[in-house]
UniProtKB/Swiss-Prot annotation, chain B:
The record marks 5, 117 as: Interaction with the K-D-E-L motif on target proteins. Keywords: Cytoplasmic vesicle, Endoplasmic reticulum, ER-Golgi transport, Golgi apparatus, Membrane, Protein transport, Receptor, Transmembrane, Transmembrane helix, Transport. The record marks 193 as: Important for recycling of cargo proteins with the sequence motif K-D-E-L from the Golgi to the endoplasmic reticulum. Receptor for the C-terminal sequence motif K-D-E-L that is present on endoplasmic reticulum resident proteins and that mediates their recycling from the Golgi back to the endoplasmic reticulum. This is ER lumen protein-retaining receptor 1-B. GO terms for cellular component: cis-Golgi network; COPI-coated vesicle membrane; endoplasmic reticulum; endoplasmic reticulum membrane; endoplasmic reticulum-Golgi intermediate compartment membrane; Golgi membrane. It is a multi-pass membrane protein. The chain crosses the membrane at residues 5-24, 33-52, 59-79, 93-110, 117-135, 150-168, 179-199. One of its GO terms (molecular function) is ER retention sequence binding. Belongs to the ERD2 family. It comes from Xenopus laevis (African clawed frog). Residues 47-48, 159-169 are annotated as: Interaction with the K-D-E-L motif on target proteins.
Length: 10, 212
């Protein structure tokens, strides 16, 4: 599950 | 980074450049929905607020800057520079019906109840429906210029490629983001009708016309 705030996609 | 995500970003960048050039060269924004472009400017603004605080890579930062700058430039051309050519009578989609539900949903369904995260979530939800005013305008005018259909195709393909990127990342990186995936699926489904028309008509040299 993605951690909040670490969105590495555009 | 994987090939699907890279091709997706290139397709997205191409769509943005195609639109910018179409309006700038023809000095006209006929057939272009200013509302959709406004929504895209909101999408990029709310999604890239961490532009200066969260450095991921040169590629990531430079693409974000290009996306934000070009979306504002496009809105400026439509509502200011070439506003005489803006076809407001056919650009009548009620954007509040897109902004309010996505804003509410971003408060209810998100990864973390913090301002940045809620704004990021809002931008993901809004992006999935931001093209509706444009598709509505094409259906209302009953046709679209060929360059506009190429713009829409590139824009639609970008999120379709991102779906493959998420499959790839789930498979090889144990990464998945359900919010982005569900919104990406909705976004891609909205283009299906257009994809069918584009492939059956525009690629055969015909003009894109919708049964009015």
């Amino acid at each position: 599950e993605v951690l909040p705030g670490d969105h590495d996609e555009l | 980074m994987n090939i699907f995500r890279f091709l997706g970003d290139i397709s997205h960048l191409s769509a943005i450049i195609i639109l910018l050039l179409k309006i700038w060269k023809s000095r006209s924004c006929a057939g272009i929905s200013g509302k959709s472009q406004l929504l895209f400017a909101i999408v990029f603004t709310t999604r890239y607020l961490d532009l200066f605080t969260n450095f991921i890579s040169f590629y990531n930062t430079s693409m974000k800057v290009v996306y934000v700058a070009s979306s504002y430039a496009t809105v400026w051309m439509i509502y200011s520079k070439f506003k005489a050519t803006y076809d407001g009578n056919h650009d009548t989609f009620r954007v509040e019906f897109l902004i309010v539900p996505t804003a509410i949903l971003s408060f209810l369904v998100n990864h973390d109840f913090t301002p940045l995260e809620i704004l990021w979530t809002f931008s993901i939800y809004l992006e999935s429906v931001a093209i509706l005013p444009q598709l509505f305008m094409v259906s209302k005018t009953g046709e679209a210029e060929t360059i506009t259909s190429h713009y829409l195709f590139a824009l639609g393909i970008y999120r379709t490629l991102y779906l493959f990127n998420w499959i790839w990342r789930y498979q090889f990186e144990e990464f998945f983001d359900l919010i982005a995936i569900v919104a990406g699926l909705v976004q891609t489904v909205l283009y299906c009708d257009f994809f069918y028309l584009y492939i059956t008509k525009v690629l055969k040299g015909k003009k894109l016309s919708l049964p009015a």
